Regions:
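N-terminal catalytic or cofactor-binding beta/alpha core of small enzyme domains
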Residues: 1-163
Length: 163
């Protein structure tokens, strides 16, 4: 296997030259590519929005492919869409036409799949988002990231020598 890097809007996948480990390293909160539109739609400045990042964790673990394991890095910031949440963790306090199904402390605190707040409970937006906008973010970022993660995990099923 050659050393490859697959890039998508939502993630970057770094493969090792030689696959030696059955572990997939995934970093769903390493994204820091903030669109101008997102920054303009927020009531917060870029520095405050970035307080929700796991800043530079991707650089801390960038050596993983050299150790023989794949590395999946988020490119989208978690303040825009949180890849470490379920796709249906939609916050009715943030997204129009969404109704609460059950009590979920993450959603209640503003940390659903589309976060309403960053650290110290600071609101990201002035008002609510439309449901189509929220679902478009999930389609564009959440699903591709999780498909890539699932594909990497399935790859190990074909390699009994790595189980």
């Amino acid at each position: 296997m050659q050393n490859m890097s697959l890039s998508h809007l939502a993630y970057e996948l770094k493969d090792p030259e030689v696959l030696r480990s059955p572990i997939v390293f995934a970093s769903p909160h390493s994204g820091r590519e903030y669109s101008k539109e997102f920054l303009q739609s927020s009531v917060l400045d870029a520095r405050v929005i970035r307080s929700s990042e796991d800043a530079y964790v991707d650089q801390l673990i960038d050596f993983i492919p050299e150790m023989g394991a794949p590395l999946l890095l988020a490119k989208v910031p978690r303040a825009y869409v949180d890849l470490n949440r379920a796709a249906d963790e939609l916050d009715p306090s943030l997204i129009n036409d969404v109704h609460s199904r059950a009590q979920n402390p993450r959603i209640t605190s503003g940390l659903g799949v589309i976060p309403r707040v960053v650290s110290n409970a600071r609101a990201i937006y002035r008002g609510k988002l439309s449901k189509p906008e929220a679902l478009a973010r999930i389609d564009q970022y959440w699903f591709p990231y999780h498909r890539a993660l699932r594909c990497e995990l399935l790859r190990f099923n074909c390699r009994p020598d790595l189980r």
